[in-house]
Amino acid sequence: MEAHQFIKAPGITTAIEQAALAAANSALANAVVVRPFLSHQQIEILINLMQPRQLVFRPEVFWNHPIQRVIHNELELYCRARSGRCLEIGAHPRSINDNPNVVHRCFLRPVGRDVQRWYTAPTRGPAANCRRSALRGLPAADRTYCLDGFSGCNFPAETGIALYSLHDMSPSDVAEAMFRHGMTRLYAALHLPPEVLLPPGTYRTASYLLIHDGRRVVVTYEGDTSAGYNHDVSNLRSWIRTTKVTGDHPLVIERVRAIGCHFVLLLTAAPEPSPMPYVPYPRSTEVYVRSIFGPGGTPSLFPTSCSTKSTFHAVPAHIWDRLMLFGATLDDQAFCCSRLMTYLRGISYKVTVGTLVANEGWNASEDALTAVITAAYLTICHQRYLRTQAISKGMRRLEREHAQKFITRLYSWLFEKSGRDYIPGRQLEFYAQCRRWLSAGFHLDPRVLVFDESAPCHCRTAIRKALSKFCCFMKWLGQECTCFLQPAEGAVGDQGHDNEAYEGSDVDPAESAISDISGSYVVPGTALQPLYQALDLPAEIVARAGRLTATVKVSQVDGRIDCETLLGNKTFRTSFVDGAVLETNGPERHNLSFDASQSTMAAGPFSLTYAASAAGLEVRYVAAGLDHRAVFAPGVSPRSAPGEVTAFCSALYRFNREAQRHSLIGNLWFHPEGLIGLFAPFSPGHVWESANPFCGESTLYTRTWSEVDAVSSPARPDLGFMSEPSIPSRAATPTLAAPLPPPAPDPSPPPSAPALAEPASGATAGAPAITHQTARHRRLLFTYPDGSKVFAGSLFESTCTWLVNASNVDHRPGGGLCHAFYQRYPASFDAASFVMRDGAAAYTLTPRPIIHAVAPDYRLEHNPKRLEAAYRETCSRLGTAAYPLLGTGIYQVPIGPSFDAWERNHRPGDELYLPELAARWFEANRPTRPTLTITEDVARTANLAIELDSATDVGRACAGCRVTPGVVQYQFTAGVPGSGKSRSITQADVDVVVVPTRELRNAWRRRGFAAFTPHTAARVTQGRRVVIDEAPSLPPHLLLLHMQRAATVHLLGDPNQIPAIDFEHAGLVPAIRPDLGPTSWWHVTHRWPADVCELIRGAYPMIQTTSRVLRSLFWGEPAVGQKLVFTQAAKPANPGSVTVHEAQGATYTETTIIATADARGLIQSSRAHAIVALTRHTEKCVIIDAPGLLREVGISDAIVNNFFLAGGEIGHQRPSVIPRGNPDANVDTLAAFPPSCQISAFHQLAEELGHRPVPVAAVLPPCPELEQGLLYLPQELTTCDSVVTFELTDIVHCRMAAPSQRKAVLSTLVGRYGGRTKLYNASHSDVRDSLARFIPAIGPVQVTTCELYELVEAMVEKGQDGSAVLELDLCNRDVSRITFFQKDCNKFTTGETIAHGKVGQGISAWSKTFCALFGPWFRAIEKAILALLPQGVFYGDAFDDTVFSAAVAAAKASMVFENDFSEFDSTQNNFSLGLECAIMEECGMPQWLIRLYHLIRSAWILQAPKESLRGFWKKHSGEPGTLLWNTVWNMAVITHCYDFRDFQVAAFKGDDSIVLCSEYRQSPGAAVLIAGCGLKLKVDFRPIGLYAGVVVAPGLGALPDVVRFAGRLTEKNWGPGPERAEQLRLAVSDFLRKLTNVAQMCVDVVSRVYGVSPGLVHNLIGMLQAVADGKAHFTESVKPVLDLTNSILCRVE
């Protein structure tokens, strides 16, 4: 039934209070700070004037005009923020030094009061020149100011501001002055009181006293201690009435800001001013009442500035309105003047009841009271007269109308029809009055005044107009017009070249001269010692640099500086251009910012300026707090000793490498010429020129190769250590040395080039004679089963057919091993002799077979795929090859990845040569062949099974065979079905093949192998080389028998397929089934079609297929090909069929899978049967699944059909799995925390947080009022009164709520999803542009079967199957059903745990059909977003915790900006949904799918077990893409609403977000978005923050939140079964694992962020240690449920 209208909301008061508190906090955060000391009356005036702005009073200064100055400062901030670089008119002297954005100031020569202002002006800075010129009558010292006034100056500027300096100029004068300046916009602050529109008099309002004598007006505010404003009345009236200026200098005047009668006018030059009527005083609080009897003679004994009394009196509007309402509604008999006087006296008293002002009152003079009573009485009398006359005349008119005859009525009907402009009663015209009549009124209300007047500019006089017409006439006659009256078009002043504020100037800006510093300079290292110390260089390098002197030759051309640095016997070249990339020793990138006109350079924290001087080149260095100047004399220095230079270079290289290994972010890579050079520490475009062509950049810091060394020590171990060369040197090509004799070829050389036809006979004719080397120093480390070997030693000792060189991309000579190859085989680098290329690798046969392989440069980018390809490209050959570890030298590829890549990509018989460092690594990580240990129990059970088997006819061959305890070594090649495991076996590798079935035996025998079934093979496997195919499906006792009897055993099979079945049900098979670990996995299948691969990718995550068949699975079609059934009982009903177990290992072109009802238990208990059935075909498979058995294990057509319907494609994408690792116990500080008492730890936690034991187990919160939607609930709301819990402590630190109660579900439904949604209709472009800071434009996204597999895998992991995925039929309710569940966990809090007034949390689950429809798209969009995230931005959980912690630790000088949304899901509306749809459209999602998503999200029904809610908008936590779109919306709000300074790291997950920066501020467009969407942001900015269960401490890292984790344990029920206690132990153990290395740091940081003692955190860690050891103590308690929902009323209908 519908009952939402009967639900009261006692909790609404709390919600209103919270909303009011949030509004107050927001207002205070944006309040105006009032600094002067004020009286109580001044405070009231200021509060009323500044409404609705919040004021914060911090009195600290005394001001002469406090009210005006506060208003002035506020309007000044507004004007300066919008004007930018501008011209200022009449600037106050005290503001000159504070506003550098002003390019010119116009002053008048000081007279009177202005002289006093100049005497108190600052005497330093720019104000000093202005002060000196103003007081001494001197001309302006520079062009930043003038003393000619605004109208007498012509300095060009596009924008100007005038703060209370235009009161003595009319709008027309200002328009002409703006034209002379070329100004298009002028912000003018003016004081325009409405009293200037009235006749002369003295007017007193609540804020000020105004004296008006008809010519001048003087205004003095309350509390002023000096004279007030004094302005010309006619000008003020012009500014109030004028909205535009016409003539030759047109402009429009718009009031853009007002505080009381202080206005900011925006004057904009416009060619055609349009009407702009405006109401100047809509918030006026005074009404001006006219005095009937004007004053006569002298008003007082003492003369004043005004010779007359006021003819109008300012009366509070509320007094006049109440008086008129009272008098107009009095009875005729009761109306009299005395009664009006009595009422006026009553409402003139101020009445206050407590803090409530019941009557504001009015403190009036006797003249004002007399005038008000007189005016009110006469006005009411006149109105009563009008009322009487109107009724009387109206009655007579009615009598005449109804007495008309037919002819008169017909005449009126024919000739007096009403038109469109007819208004009933308007044509009667009972009464008309004149403006000067007494009946015209006695008061003026400024609230209804409307002005729209235009003022003509003064340049168009009558004579000027006549002469202009005459000129035009002369032009018409063809005469030259010499009219001097025409205004100068485009007058922009005579000095526009040096004015940056004027953008429309036609004068080209003058370019500053660039000083030329070309020449030769001497750079001693001693001159740069302070810089070295600021760079934190080691003392050794500083000392060595101090002993060196360099000569730097500088050439400067077109903003580019080229330097040639001569340091000892080495020459370096650098090129300085703007934007040049600087080499770094970490992932951070630096670009050089170079401005030749300003002679500055900067990059990162380093900057310098240079200038030519008489003494040479003067350079100023700024780095790390250092400000150092050095002067380098011109000339040439003597050369430094080569040994000293080499030692310096080597020490510098070691320092760079050390910094590279230990730095997370990195710094500049310091080159020699970067430290001993003019522009230290920059060295862009670094090139070292060497006379030796073999000594490239890589040998700058190492020993240079020499021909003598190569000849005398051909087997030098370190020849193969360095893998890659760098950029080859620019030196000229020298004379080539004779190659050394290479090793002898293989006894059986390859007949042809690799993968090529037979080469020409002369291909190797030029090769020298090949002889064996006499000395062999290599050491064998390991031999693989395929014959491959790993050696420690030199590559050139190998006798393999091919040698592999670590080359560069251009295959040119370089350093390291490449240099050694060039010394021995220089002809091998001739590109013309390359016989083949495979990818980046090049093959050559001259002078011997060599492969030039190219590894990736890990200094630039980590590219594992390229590393794999580097080895794979060397396998297109015949014969064996000798490899180095590619990339582990100069390119800095780690040893492990390079070795693993070689293991996966080599051919049998190949050799790998390791240097000593890599050899030591290999010996520590030596691969071992797996072993199987047969225990006595296993042997005894296997022998029992053999005895039982030997008693049968099949197993007679096993009689007498026994399994003995021992260790068996084996090789197990596992792979996906159809991967070619069997085809990889050759007859030369095996003597006997053992297979489980006759079909497989026959297949092997057809290939020429001696194949046997398991039982008969017992006679022939003794001492033979045995291959066991489909090993996991062999009976385990026979498998153990053959493995133990064979000389070598090679297992083939798939661990995921059907294992051995215990047909006898004796229990022996599972008892002795061995645990075999594959030694290698093959993931490429040549059998499976693409859809099969994706459907069962959950069992084979890395599977790939070579099949070109995209879709092969079909439902509901006739049977084709081989029929497969699951049970023997189904075979008679399907003639020609075989069971899946019998078909294992077989391959068919077409198959039909028939699932019968008797196979339900088999399929549910063994998903392997379904996998085998699906993987037997190569082209087509028809599934006949009447009982729906395969659908129950996730195999159905609905998922596939919906996937292709949504635009999915078959293909491969990057998997969404993020690699994670467990931290090593390198600093095991957790071991110092012994287990502690659980009770004491929780009691100390309660004491610190202020929580106390509570007598209730749960709370039913009040149900809020349903504001939108329809609620349906059952007639009975039954609840339980108590709850039984197994708890760790009786003190709970979470918000308590009852998850299982019907009333709790009801309150959660209404509270979370029944509130009013604030809609916001606006364009998404601004928010999307802001979001582009974190998520750039995404572009089309491809949805592939990889995302479909991940979706199916996630469903299977959650225990779901495909039965809930239906065909997309929107008429079916099950397709679009959204179910709702109450969440059983609550949020940790340090505040109130019971009386929090918060409703529970819920989970809304979309239908599995919609999840399968949208899920792949959202996964693909998420991958695209992750690929585009900038450095330092972390999304959701898609990162390793150690990476995030390292990024936080690197941001040492940052603060933590932390935001927490309130009601994040509830406030999402049409705008956030529109942003989601806009991003979906940007990614290429089909339009019908976007519209369907918008429809589902905009109107929905949440279906709880017994309740339902029909609502609109909001966000549901269980819908697909919840984390994705919540995180995107969070990113959009944060980046649109806030600007961050020194941004370092940002992390977003759902509604949680942090940003590490030095400062933040709210962006200009934030208020519009926050107010439009009703967002509730709770921002905190502190040194340490909280985010997603971790404590974020800049400079230290992300640390586990011990207090929060321990607090959440107190709320859960850990019973009644032991499995809950085990879950607790595992969860605590996982959490403690994160504390392994940071436990002590957590104690210090977590205690600080929560404000608790470090001893508490220490005690909590000890308590968690005890729980992880299984020593947790649980207490069973029975507590009542606190029901606060008594206000829920239910009506039975």
Curated annotation (Swiss-Prot):
Cellular component annotations (GO), alphabetically ordered: host cell perinuclear region of cytoplasm
Methyltransferase as annotated region, ranges: 60-240
Region described as Zinc-binding: spans on this chain: 510-691
The record's account of how the chain is modified after translation: ORF1 polyprotein does not seem to be processed into distinct enzymatic domains by a viral protease belonging to ORF1, but could be processed by a host serine protease like thrombin.
Assigned keywords, A-Z: ATP-binding, Disulfide bond, Helicase, Host cytoplasm, Hydrolase, Magnesium, Metal-binding, Methyltransferase, Nucleotide-binding, Nucleotidyltransferase, Protease, RNA-binding, RNA-directed RNA polymerase, Thiol protease, Transferase, Viral RNA replication, Zinc
Domain (+)RNA virus helicase ATP-binding: 934-1082
Record PROSITE patterns: ALPHAVIRUS_MT, MACRO, PSRV_HELICASE, RDRP_SSRNA_POS
Keyword Amino-acid biosynthesis: no
Pfam (any one): Vmethyltransf
Binding site for ATP: G975, V976, P977, G978, S979, G980, K981, S982
Residue numbers spanned by region RNA-directed RNA polymerase: 1207-1693
GO molecular function, one term: helicase activity
Domain notes: Contains a methyltransferase domain, a Y-domain, a putative protease region, a zinc-binding region with similarity to calycins, a proline-rich disordered hypervariable region (HVR), a macro domain (also called X-domain), a helicase domain and an RNA-dependent RNA polymerase domain. Since the boundaries and the activity of the putative protease are not clearly defined, the zinc-binding region might be part of the putative protease.
Family to which the UniProt record says this protein belongs: Belongs to the hepevirus non-structural polyprotein family.
Protein name stated in the entry: Non-structural polyprotein pORF1
